[in-house]
């Protein structure tokens, strides 16, 4: 499980577990690595009271999609159409109003006949984060699916499994892939800055092929004329 920085498309804060390790256990470790100045987006299947609570400790703002079956009382309608609500550790706690964490509920539909989307946000003041702006930002959540595909297929190639056959070496393979992906994305970010464009506008596959061509020229990643050439080529 990992975090993604949406501007650079860099994966960070990753956590690796065994087959029997639950996503909830990994997620709790990962959210502890959220930067305090971040806005964290998450899919509806990640939400739980303990995980929301753990993510808040990081200081980051949260914007998570909610499952349709979760009860979220609409306590007060705000100027932008969102609502103040509270989340509780259990139905019993909700009935007694014990342990509630204030949050903001944003509801919207994408078209006729489609279900309602619900976003839960830790930013309570709509003036700091209007509902429409948050809905637009949430679309970036899908970026992580594209980036994980880069890691699984475009960087590693068509192989279905990692090459190692023992746990310790498999872990090393995993971290090596993450480091390689970080290196590619870091160079793409530098190239994007050089050309004043978004990193997401560059082709990851093209970047990997370009780096592979230039790699024999390098013994390290120290700044050099060759590195400058690589940045321009990537753009």
Model-derived segments and spans:
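Single, function-defining residue in the core of a domain
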Residues: 1-235
